[in-house]
Amino acid sequence: MAPTPPPKQKGKLTLAQLAAYDDIVTDALVDRAFFWTKIRKNRPKYFAVRGVVEDDVTSILLHDVIVAKDVIKAEKSLLNLSGLRKYVETLKSDKEKEWFRRHLRKYIAIYLPDCPFEVTTTNRYTITTHEAALSARKFIRTGDTIKHLSGTLVAITPEEEKTLDLTRRDFSIVMSSRKKTPSLFLGPARFSNHDCNPNARLVTKGSEGMEIVAIRDISIGEEITVSYGENYFGVDNCECLCHTCELSLSNGWSPGGPPEHDSRASTPETTEHQEKSSSGSEKRKSPPESPSHPSEDMPSKRPKFENILNLRLEISPPSSPDPIAEPLITVNGGLRALRSHFASLAGKSDLRHFQKPHSNFISASSSSDQTSCSLCPDDEAPTSTRSTSATSISDSNVQVKTEPTVEQQPRASSETAPKTISGDHGLHVQDIIRDNDESDLSDLSASWEINDREMTAVKREPVKKKKRKRKSSIIPTIEHEAPKARTPGDYTKTPKLLAQRYDRWVDCQTCNAWFVQGDAYLTRKECPRCERHSKLYGYRWPKTDREGRNDTEERVMDHRTIHRFLRTEDEARVQRRGRGVSHATSPTPDVSENKTETDASEFGDERRLTRSLRRARSSLRLAI
């Protein structure tokens, strides 16, 4: 009998699939259920699903989940929404669709009236941003498994772990004590934060499930916390900012704060920077020096050519009668070197006799050798309004001419006779340069100029150069500021969260917690957490359903019928001085502290009076 083949391994839920499911469900069932902020998504480039409207979601949660307590019916109603329906259609297999429905049911169950917790936020960790948290709305006994607080575990491969180290955005990675492998857990249980003295612990259920069990009594309004590990926030959790560390002034809440980083290595030396900058400026300002081109003979200004493309150089060796065309001569190339060399030689020999150097003075391309150049005589070279007189050299025939597009004019006879120099290496100089205002080639050098009347070169008077004094300046450096030491309670009643003029801290009339109300022209009664609870369940927080037969309070089915602001007489008792900011911080809010919200002195004497006092004054005026 042939052995039976091994059973095929069932497909497992991957990390990418679970992260996508969790982003879709939290966007639909948390962010669009009267939530005052956005839950962090696993994918950084997540876009909200279209076709999911907040009114439709909250209506399904109220009628199907809270009142009817039918999770299956609510699941079907939610999947009929256009946004979720289109997403389910994109899933390839039936198994993937079942995984998504299973994950959706976990989030639907947290809205059941018997659920002992709810999703809220806290700004204890970052002050300016709110992180998700879990708050108990029912008393939880020690050893009880917190109902509906579960999650899904997925093992992380080494490749995925490397990617998550760079892109992960929250603390959803746990180390399994049984498998000794890192795993990502998502679901409602992911919102439980860390505490060094937690009131609950994570327990695995099956191969892919996770639950949270209370290890001590959890009272109403207390945050549900677990332990992430001993070294999760640094060595011995030295950077932990949990509530226990806040009360004990330890770890991240220690008065000393984090150590400051030494910034001397990142700060450049001032003198070295100045020397580099001065040397760089000198290199830019001064021309390059060479043995054949002294620095004092170089022109002070760089000549500019308007028609530089029309200027060409043709070089032919003495043995061949036909000239060979060469590339264009640039301003910094042959012509400038030729003019500079003539000026230096003319200065040494007083424009009468000078000897040609044996070294070449025109730099050609890297592939060709350097060669001596000469200009044609006056009667052979055509001129134009853009050209100057040329200088001829007997060793080689070098012509500077313009393109036919330039208008040419007959050249006038030269007033000065050409100067000749005898010798094998002698040079015949016919004309040094002519005065032409339209061309910058008329400049011999910085030390010579042309006499207009005699048409001769005259040495210029030396010009005194002003030495610029080097100014010492402070070099600004970009350094990262060391994180400031945290103080207990610095995230409550702080001015850092009052961005607008009318923002202020307000005391909740239900849970006695301080919250920031934006544009607080009228003071709200409840904080966002209590107001959201009232809109969803129709009762005041933390009540979710009738408490026995004798409870006659009716559930409010339409939240729009509830007035969410203080009454006139209650508003009159509120002091607006200080905008609710407290300078003496404490880890727990002081309930007995007077509610001081907006400084009335900023708006004048007229706004110091509340509306009730204005009405009383107007009634007195009418009576009189």
From Swiss-Prot:
Role, per record: Histone methyltransferase that trimethylates 'Lys-20' of histone H4 to form H4K20me3.
Primary location recorded for the protein, binned into one broad class: nucleus
Any one Gene Ontology cellular component term annotated for this protein: nucleus
Protein source organism: Coccidioides immitis (strain RS) (Valley fever fungus)
Record's compositionally biased regions (Low complexity): 363-374, 383-396
Known catalytic reactions: L-lysyl(20)-[histone H4] + 3 S-adenosyl-L-methionine = N(6),N(6),N(6)-trimethyl-L-lysyl(20)-[histone H4] + 3 S-adenosyl-L-homocysteine + 3 H(+)
Family recorded in the similarity comment: Belongs to the class V-like SAM-binding methyltransferase superfamily. Histone-lysine methyltransferase family. Suvar4-20 subfamily.
Start and end residues of each SET domain: 115-229
A GO BP entry: methylation
UniProt GO molecular function: histone H4K20 trimethyltransferase activity
Entry-linked InterPro entries: Hist-Lys_N-MTase_N, Set9_fungi, SET_dom, SET_dom_sf, Suv4-20/Set9
One Pfam family of this chain: SET
Basic residues bias (residue ranges): 462-472
Keyword Methyltransferase: yes
Protein name in UniProt: Histone-lysine N-methyltransferase SET9
Entry EC no(s): 2.1.1.372
Bias (Basic and acidic residues) ranges: 259-287, 592-609
